Amino acid sequence: MTELSGERRTIALETTGFMPEVEGDALFVAALAAGKVCPGLPMVEIGSYCGRSTVWFGAAAQICNTLLFAVDHHGGSEENQIGWEWHDPTLVDESTGQLNTLPHFEKTMSRAGLTETVRTVVGDSPTIASTWTQEIAMCFIDGGHARDVAANDYAAWNGHIALGGILAIHDVFTDPALGGQAPYEEIYLAAKNSGKFADVSATGSLRVLTRVK
């Protein structure tokens, strides 16, 4: 199986977010591989937004008969805030005036039939990681693009990935003209330079690595 199909694919593509179709399929394939190498271990997504990528990831986790923990504070990244390029006013909670993607995420999971597979974890990624005790088959980092945020996400979660497990990183751009450098320098290069991770695939801005030691 190389791609998400049927109604779930339609739901994913209808969901607000930044995951291109071909990269979603690559994420799906990577998660299936992680579940095969590390059977029974849960998976983690950092930065779920409205759940677009989570449909691909969660569908794979369901096939692997495991759980996906979707970690997000649901207040949006820096670039999603009012006045920034990627701000979406339809995601603002009128009662608070603040961005709140949680209701949209929960609706997406319900529509996709993934509420039994995807566990919604609302909070700061490093804080959640600090109390995490179990190895994971895969970690997909798609959080904020500020350098400290990206570095903290990697530092917090890379050690929880099991040997043979997968680290996937979104928005990896080697050329600064194409996008921010934090995911590339603070996560991808940090992983490669650690000697603990080796490249598996590159699809668009999605990089997939496996833990080798």
Would you name each region that the model predicts?
Residues 2-18, 28-213:
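S-adenosylmethionine/decaboxylated-SAM
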Residues 19-23:
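Phosphate/oxyanion-binding active-site loops and adjacent basic polyanion-contact surfaces
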